[in-house]
């Protein structure tokens, strides 16, 4: 069976690019699949599941595309401000965050906004859904890390941090998560909700993606990608990936092979094969694509759904969610209980957003 994926990138020029990458023998070949003038302002963020691609923009809209039918599915209008983060949970839900401080939970069957959280006093900068779909994390410009109980649709916990974090990610198993502040990556353990180690990168971090629970890829404001051991926090490999600074990373798994996809200010997208038995050696370049555009965001779509299959519900039980919510007997200065957090939460159940249904094929 021929291996084939779609590399998707957004850019300052308001365009969504799609490139087909497929394997022929030992070679990976790329070809332009589509270009689409997606927004009226620069594309800021991308998210995919095995059916749809969602794009967010500075024009304050979320555009939905059906990758199987190759048609524009519609627009979601709810936020007031640049869309800063998008993430699908399987085929059922999409979470969006924006400069207006809101996190919206969308049902992907009817594309209704089921819930709206007043998530942060400032902008929402990053969000991440636990593999179980029961918890989510978010960071914003109010110097807080917030935990959301998606089972009951409410705030679970608020942790004050010293500086604004701009990236948060769960590990593949959901047992760890990372919070990125400027040039540092704090590694947290879910069980204790405490920092178990800190990775120090030489440059400000633009992207960080788990390859496995034990290995994370980090890109900063430079041409280099580094792989760090999350247990020892040591750099196990670094290599020059691009001619200009690396903007985005995305990790996929193809038939047991871990692949890091990178995009850069030089307009190139590259695919790197990680040899998990020889992590210290530089990854091999599988293919590269020149877009001649100023790239802003990156993702990959797998027609087979290998990378976007429904996530396991075994990682976090209902009791674990309750344990996360339970206030501590003694509250530290930098922590806030759910009771205090609930005062800032706004929930609008089953509110229908304005939608624009289109059947316009991309050129």
Swiss-Prot record:
Residues 309-363 are annotated as: Disordered. It comes from the Eukaryota. Residues 347-363 have a biased composition (Basic residues). It is found in: Nucleus, Nucleolus. It holds the Pfam family WD40. Its main location: nucleus. PANTHER family: P21-ACTIVATED PROTEIN KINASE-INTERACTING PROTEIN 1, PAK1 INTERACTING PROTEIN 1. This is p21-activated protein kinase-interacting protein 1-like.
């Amino acid at each position: 069976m021929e291996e084939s994926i779609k590399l998707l990138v957004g850019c300052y020029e308001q365009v969504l690019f799609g490139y087909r990458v497929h394997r022929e023998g030992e070679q990976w070949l790329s070809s332009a699949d589509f270009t689409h003038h997606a927004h009226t302002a620069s594309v800021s963020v991308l998210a995919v599941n095995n059916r749809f691609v969602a794009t967010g923009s500075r024009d304050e809209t979320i555009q939905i595309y059906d990758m199987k039918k190759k048609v524009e599915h519609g627009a979601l209008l709810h936020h007031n401000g640049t869309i800063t983060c998008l993430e699908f949970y399987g085929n059922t839900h999409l979470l969006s965050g924006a400069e207006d401080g809101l996190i919206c939970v969308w049902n992907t069957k009817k594309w209704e906004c089921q819930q709206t959280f007043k998530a942060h006093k400032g902008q929402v900068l990053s969000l991440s859904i636990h593999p179980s779909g029961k918890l989510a994390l978010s960071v914003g410009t109010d110097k807080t890390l917030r935990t959301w109980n998606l089972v009951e649709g409410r705030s679970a916990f608020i942790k004050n941090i010293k500086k604004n974090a701009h990236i948060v990610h769960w590990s593949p198993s959901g047992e760890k998560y990372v919070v990125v502040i400027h040039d540092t990556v704090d590694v947290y353990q879910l069980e204790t909700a405490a920092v178990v180690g800190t990775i120090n990168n030489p440059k400000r971090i633009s992207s960080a993606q788990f390859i496995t629970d034990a290995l994370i890829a980090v890109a900063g404001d430079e041409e280099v990608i580094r792989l760090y051991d999350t247990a020892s926090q040591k750099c196990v490999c670094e290599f020059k990936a691009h001619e200009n600074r690396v903007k985005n990373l995305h990790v996929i798994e193809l038939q047991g092979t871990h692949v890091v996809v990178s995009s850069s200010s030089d307009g190139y997208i590259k695919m790197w094969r990680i040899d998990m038995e020889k992590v210290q050696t530089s990854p091999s370049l599988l293919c590269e694509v020149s877009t001649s555009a100023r790239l802003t965001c990156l993702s990959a779509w797998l027609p087979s759904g290998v990378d976007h299959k429904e996530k396991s519900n075994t990682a976090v039980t209902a009791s674990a969610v309750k344990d996360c919510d339970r206030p501590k007997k003694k509250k530290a200065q930098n922590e806030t209980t759910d009771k205090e957090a609930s005062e800032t939460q706004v929930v609008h159940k089953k509110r229908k957003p304005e939608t624009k249904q289109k059947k316009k094929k991309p050129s």
